[in-house]
Amino acid sequence: MPPLVSLDSTVVATTEQISAHFTGSVVILGLRVGSYYSLDEVGAFVWSLVQEPLQVSDIRDAILEEYEVEHARCESDLLALLEDLAANQLIDIESDPRI
């Protein structure tokens, strides 16, 4: 099965969740399936970005600008995080319309 999220995808936090920010982290309660999710500092940064629809490549670029991380590691970790958030129904994904 191909990945759901690519660098060309647009992602946005679902409206069916409640989140709370704490110092350096965020916790999310997914109302669709009753899932509870906790994110570290970088995950919280990503979560803040996906409150509005944003292309995954733009999220990657923002992380690279904000944190010291290798490009390839940033990309793979970001895609894994977004896949996990999608699996827990915490984000909605719009694929590249050209595909």
Model-derived regions: residue spans:
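Long, charge-rich, low-complexity alpha-helical segments
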Residues: 22, 35-99
